[in-house]
Amino acid sequence: MANNSSYGENVRRKSHTPSAIVIGSGFAGIAAANALRNASFEVVLLESRDRIGGRIHTDYSFGFPVDLGASWLHGVCEENPLAPIIGRLGLPLYRTSGDDSVLFDHDLESYALYDTKGHQVPQELVEKIGKVFETILEETGKLREETKEDISIAKAIAIVMERNPHLRQEGIAHDVLQWYLCRMEGWFATDADAISLQGWDQEVLLPGGHGLMVRGYRPVINTLAKGLDIRLGHRVVEIVRHRNRVEVTVSSGKTFVADAAVIAVPLGVLKANTIKFEPRLPEWKEEAIRELSVGVENKIILHFSEVFWPNVEFLGVVSSTTYGCSYFLNLHKATGHPVLVYMPAGRLACDIEKLSDEAAAQFAFSQLKKILPNAAEPIHYLVSHWGSDENTLGSYTFDGVGKPRDLYEKLRIPVDNLFFAGEATSVQYTGTVHGAFSTGLMAAEECRMRVLERFRELDMLEMCHPAMGEQTATVSVPLLISRL
């Protein structure tokens, strides 16, 4: 394709070929570009990084794949829109939980908890407090029905404790309860005092539990990206919309022109106002961007020469506060490799991002030493920085206190010939890969309909849905699910 200063306008004028620019190559952007390409659009995808995937980032520097970003398929079932692709590629999944609950064990079925002195907490106590935590959350549901005013889940729990003294815990039992709350904070990528009581359990959960992508998500994103015109290192700085075209300018000064654009950048980037819109977006759209909340969860991945820890899904350190708690995902069970993943969220994750990678890895290892004092030093490590990375500025969206859920839909709704996609635009599946994927398909379909309606050629093309061309054949290949 010619490297000219404008894209799409001349093609449209000469041949009436519909054109679109997609901004962002995460799952939403790749899905949208793939769908539009399959609908016979001329498509260019602009990506600010030197790689595709966005918050999908499979790293191979250890000699095997590990995901620094999203790694779970939430909803291991045929209903998951990603299941057909994963099944056809023959990618194995390791089911970490058959339970689709988010109450306290959304992605783990076995775990070993320790106090800060390295003493393992009796499993009977761990299970007992898990049930107490579930009861507490059920009681917060009753509290929600009493008032229309939204409060944080932390405040709601405090009220429940005050009303139900028998649910209060002391000593090590209190610390275990804090660990469960810490796990809940990890699900939302923020602290409990920022999680909405009204909205925390309103997402739609697909059946089938949760599965780790054993070989990472990169094979899926690479498959969807095959054959697309992707321009890496193209950071969008301005989007100008006209009645019949969109002009997108990147940091080098080059401008691309097309009939429409799909904006699939993370919510954090939109909130930072690093992309100028001309004319400005409507107030209701700016409000959605401003009011929606984005959290931070990171991974510090420690690679060891051998396994020296218990054969459980999670290792955890309990503490008197959620900030002092920690947990490690044991990748050895899923992949066979001696790897532990430390996963801080919220304020702790932001504080750790201020450290160097070496210091962050050392901090994670110090948490492990609390569990296993004789732990061997890691031979390699990887550290994510989703909160401070200028290409993301956050991990994923969560329900903030006092914020209406219609903000997700407001963020999704098109503005003229601008269409929006990404996990933050998914009303049902916020914060998930399949949510991002689905919104990309939705934005592509809306874009197709608008552009072709303007061309008065609605019958010209027939778009497969979910727009993957021959990749979405009716033949269904079962998912490869294991428990080691």
Curated annotation (Swiss-Prot):
<keyword id="KW-0576">Peroxisome</keyword>
<comment type="pathway">
    <text>Amine and polyamine degradation; spermidine degradation.</text>
</comment>
<dbReference type="GO" id="GO:0050660">
    <property type="term" value="F:flavin adenine dinucleotide binding"/>
</dbReference>
<protein>
    <recommendedName>
        <fullName>Polyamine oxidase 3</fullName>
        <ecNumber>1.5.3.-</ecNumber>
    </recommendedName>
</protein>
<dbReference type="Pfam" id="PF01593">
    <property type="entry name" value="Amino_oxidase"/>
</dbReference>
<feature type="short sequence motif" description="Microbody targeting signal">
    <location>
        <begin position="482"/>
        <end position="484"/>
    </location>
</feature>
<feature type="binding site">
    <location>
        <position position="423"/>
    </location>
    <ligand>
        <name>FAD</name>
    </ligand>
</feature>
<comment type="similarity">
    <text>Belongs to the flavin monoamine oxidase family.</text>
</comment>
<dbReference type="InterPro" id="IPR002937">
    <property type="entry name" value="Amino_oxidase"/>
</dbReference>
<dbReference type="GO" id="GO:1903602">
    <property type="term" value="P:thermospermine catabolic process"/>
</dbReference>
<dbReference type="InterPro" id="IPR001613">
    <property type="entry name" value="Flavin_amine_oxidase"/>
</dbReference>
<comment type="function">
    <text>Flavoenzyme involved in polyamine back-conversion. Catalyzes the oxidation of the secondary amino group of polyamines, such as spermine, spermidine and their acetyl derivatives. Substrate preference is spermidine &gt; norspermine &gt; thermospermine &gt; N(1)-acetylspermine &gt; spermine. No activity detected when putrescine is used as substrate. Plays an important role in the regulation of polyamine intracellular concentration.</text>
</comment>
<keyword id="KW-0274">FAD</keyword>
<dbReference type="GO" id="GO:0052903">
    <property type="term" value="F:N(1)-acetylpolyamine oxidase (3-acetamidopropanal-forming) activity"/>
</dbReference>
<keyword id="KW-0285">Flavoprotein</keyword>
<dbReference type="GO" id="GO:1990534">
    <property type="term" value="F:thermospermine oxidase activity"/>
</dbReference>
<dbReference type="GO" id="GO:0052901">
    <property type="term" value="F:spermine oxidase activity"/>
</dbReference>
<feature type="binding site">
    <location>
        <position position="236"/>
    </location>
    <ligand>
        <name>FAD</name>
    </ligand>
</feature>
<dbReference type="GO" id="GO:0005777">
    <property type="term" value="C:peroxisome"/>
</dbReference>
<comment type="pathway">
    <text>Amine and polyamine degradation; spermine degradation.</text>
</comment>
<dbReference type="GO" id="GO:0046203">
    <property type="term" value="P:spermidine catabolic process"/>
</dbReference>
<feature type="binding site">
    <location>
        <position position="55"/>
    </location>
    <ligand>
        <name>FAD</name>
    </ligand>
</feature>
<keyword id="KW-0560">Oxidoreductase</keyword>
<dbReference type="GO" id="GO:0046208">
    <property type="term" value="P:spermine catabolic process"/>
</dbReference>
<feature type="binding site">
    <location>
        <position position="47"/>
    </location>
    <ligand>
        <name>FAD</name>
    </ligand>
</feature>
<dbReference type="InterPro" id="IPR050281">
    <property type="entry name" value="Flavin_monoamine_oxidase"/>
</dbReference>
<dbReference type="InterPro" id="IPR036188">
    <property type="entry name" value="FAD/NAD-bd_sf"/>
</dbReference>
